[in-house]
């Protein structure tokens, strides 16, 4: 699933491609992707003649801001957007097509069909699901080690599970939680409330640095991820533990282990992470 670095990269690349384009029509080939409004015809009608003014990211969500409508899009497992000329053949698994007045098309592809799209009046999108109750952005001033300490001091959850909870800090998923914990030398099965003030400060720094570096490298292309221009990310080349089961730790040479924490496959170094 695309996490913060991948979604941020998609946002940046799409911004270069589609800002200022106006919707001339929409083709929906898989109606289940459209969640709000539930009626596909209403979805199409609301976006007709709307111009894309900006694209934002909130956690793992893309927010397409039109004249008076915001489309909240979640890529889920394998969703992707690409800009095409209308004459180009449709790629496999194309489920929603946004036809622009200049003849180009923004096409949404999704092998798994898990992605979602919601429309809301501009200004209301943060107050309702799926954005309501999301935690702080990890690149914001509000994200501090003190925030983590306060959020986790009364929980009995393991630190990996706690970090995956989008109500505390957004954008972290399986890849970057594993990587941040590795950098912080913290075992993923440690109870979150057991971390000391010093350990939490190290973890906070590891989260921010991991995400910053991943964004700089365009995210991680583990499976099918590409950005809005069809380019792969490069951060997978720097992964310390994720996807490296039985490979030597880059720090100590011990074989990386894989276990299950909170129902999620979890990679760690048994020597470096305590």
UniProtKB/Swiss-Prot annotation:
Its cofactor is Zn(2+). PROSITE patterns: FPG_CAT (PS51068), ZF_FPG_1 (PS01242), ZF_FPG_2 (PS51066). Its EC number is 3.2.2.23, 4.2.99.18. A zinc finger (FPG-type) spans 240-274. HAMAP family: Fapy_DNA_glycosyl. Involved in base excision repair of DNA damaged by oxidation or by mutagenic agents. Acts as a DNA glycosylase that recognizes and removes damaged bases. Has a preference for oxidized purines, such as 7,8-dihydro-8-oxoguanine (8-oxoG). Has AP (apurinic/apyrimidinic) lyase activity and introduces nicks in the DNA strand. Cleaves the DNA backbone by beta-delta elimination to generate a single-strand break at the site of the removed base with both 3'- and 5'-phosphates. Belongs to the FPG family. NCBIfam families: fpg (TIGR00577), PRK01103.1 (NF002211). This is Formamidopyrimidine-DNA glycosylase. The lineage of its organism: Bacteria, Bacillati, Bacillota, Bacilli, Bacillales. The gene is mutM.
């Amino acid at each position: 699933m695309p996490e913060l670095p991948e979604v941020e990269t998609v946002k940046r690349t799409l911004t270069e491609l589609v800002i200022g384009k106006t919707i001339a029509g929409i083709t929906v080939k898989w109606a289940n992707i459209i969640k709000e409004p539930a009626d596909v015809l209403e979805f199409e009608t609301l976006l007709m003649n709307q111009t894309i003014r900006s694209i934002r990211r909130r956690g793992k969500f893309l927010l397409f801001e039109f004249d008076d409508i915001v489309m909240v899009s979640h890529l889920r497992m394998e969703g992707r957007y690409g800009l095409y000329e209308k004459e180009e053949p449709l790629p496999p698994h194309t489920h929603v097509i946004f036809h622009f007045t200049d003849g180009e098309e923004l096409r949404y592809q999704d092998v798994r069909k898990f992605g979602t799209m919601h429309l809301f009046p501009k200004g209301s999108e943060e107050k309702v699901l799926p954005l309501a109750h999301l935690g702080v952005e990890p690149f914001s001033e509000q994200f501090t080690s003190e925030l983590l300490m306060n959020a986790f001091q009364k929980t009995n959850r393991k630190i990996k599970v706690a970090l995956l909870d989008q109500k505390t800090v957004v954008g972290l998923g399986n890849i970057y939680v594993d990587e941040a914990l590795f950098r912080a030398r913290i075992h993923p099965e440690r109870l979150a409330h057991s971390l000391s003030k010093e350990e939490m400060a190290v973890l906070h720094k590891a989260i921010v640095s991991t995400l910053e570096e991943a964004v700089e490298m365009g995210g991680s292309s583990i499976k099918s991820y590409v950005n809005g221009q069809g380019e792969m990310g490069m951060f997978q080349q720097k992964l310390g533990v994720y996807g490296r089961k039985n490979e030597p730790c880059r720090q100590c040479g011990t074989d990386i282990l894989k276990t299950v924490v909170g129902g999620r496959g979890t990679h760690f170094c048994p020597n470096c992470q305590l």
